[in-house]
Design a protein with these regions (language model features):
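ATP-dependent adenylation/nucleotidyltransferase module used to activate substrates
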Residues: 1-179
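ATP/NTP-dependent adenylation/nucleotidyl-transfer catalytic domains that generate, transfer
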Residues: 158, 170-269
Length: 269
């Protein structure tokens, strides 16, 4: 069992928002108090490498946070399309500016309640066998430093890691279920969920919607999830609405080309 429960972890550290990477970046920004305006300074700088160096001197020991906010690497090179920057979620920087969070953001509840207990259990074993599958996506589909082969490897500390299900596809899994008449948990078979993780975790983009699916069966669970993660659910809804409005605005601007005349612009004689 974890030394710290989910409720205490969230109270002490904060609530996840959008993704673990986004949560870590925003947690650092909140703790360090770095102004969002550094992103504008970097964007407007002619010499971005020099500006990045200057920001590093102005805000020491904040390298990852500077890179996160400015969407760049430590050399000052723009990196707008990688997962480690704030705008990996479209318009997130502008949204945070216009609607700053009134709660602490963090994904450390995952470390406290899942990762640390797992590490404590597995540290004395020679081999660690886990059930990750590549088709689950996310970090599980990306090669890791200790596991370039993905299915089997030896780590730097002498342990072996084995993922026997890694190359089992969703199609394989469906065949196996039908062939052997396997019944999934009620979460899938009755409640209608497509994938589960920590109950109510806001990292899932449809966490709040999934809670409504299980409300008729688990009303107390739904109530508890809202008490723990509710601020993140509401903030996610605000962000989704903001993103939708911005995308519609951009689409409208692209349709209206400056200088282009329409049929109704011509004066009838």
């Amino acid at each position: 069992r974890p030394k710290v429960g989910i409720v205490q972890a969230v109270r002490e550290h904060g609530v996840p928002f959008v993704s673990k990477i986004m949560s870590a970046g925003l947690e650092g920004w909140q703790k360090k108090g770095i102004p969002l305006s550094i992103a504008d300074e970097y964007a407007q700088a002619g010499d971005k490498a020099e500006k990045r160096r200057e920001l590093g001197e102005r805000f020491p020991k904040c390298e990852s946070i500077i890179n996160f906010l400015c969407c760049c690497n430590s050399e000052g090179e723009p990196r707008p399309d990688i997962q480690l920057v704030i705008n990996s979620s479209k318009y997130m920087l502008d949204f945070i500016r216009e609607c700053p969070p009134d709660f602490q953001i963090s994904a450390q509840c995952c470390d406290c309640c899942k990762k640390q207990p797992a590490y404590n259990v597995q540290k004395d074993y020679e081999m660690i066998i886990t059930g990750e599958r590549r088709d689950e996506g996310g970090m599980r589909s990306v090669p890791r430093k200790d596991n370039t082969a993905l299915c089997f490897t030896e780590t730097s500390d002498g342990q072996y890691r084995f993922r026997p299900l890694y190359y089992v596809t969703d199609r394989d899994k469906a065949w196996y279920k039908e062939r052997f008449g396997i019944r999934y948990s009620d979460a899938y078979e009755i409640y209608g969920l497509t994938r589960t993780g920590c109950c109510g975790c806001p990292v899932s983009y449809k966490a709040a919607d999934d809670l409504e699916l299980i409300r008729p069966y688990e009303p107390n669970v739904v109530k508890a999830a809202w008490n723990i993660f509710g601020k993140s659910y509401e903030y996610r809804r605000k962000y989704n609405a903001y993103k939708k409005a911005r995308m519609a605005e951009e689409k409208k601007k692209k349709a209206n080309v400056d200088g282009q005349m329409e049929l109704f612009d011509f004066i009838e004689e």
